[in-house]
């Protein structure tokens, strides 16, 4: 099953997207955008940048968990992962984004 981007409006009225892997697990979430076109541009940026391993930035949280950000060429964060309990789990999450995002469908949620 292919991955998908879910584009939705949050309670604050901002547009956001989340990338779900083929198994339904959310693997990347965006920050809020003021417009639908901004959200669409964010999705396009994920597709463009996820194929470059240098665009992923892995971090260890104070609680000892691992997470990553996907960044655009200008250094701006495009999306953030969930927390992973292991370094290898985080690496697998990055690989899953790189594999899922380029061909993921976009679903509009209301």
PLM regions and their residue ranges:
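A short, aromatic/hydrophobic, helix- or strand-capping loop or linear motif
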Residues: 53-55, 108-109
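Glycine-rich beta-strand-turn "strand-cap" elements at beta-sheet edges
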Residues: 98-110
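A structural feature that tracks compact, well-ordered secondary-structure segments
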Residues: 4-8, 14-22, 27-33, 42-49, ...
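Alpha-helical recognition helix of canonical C2H2 zinc-finger domains
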Residues: 39, 90
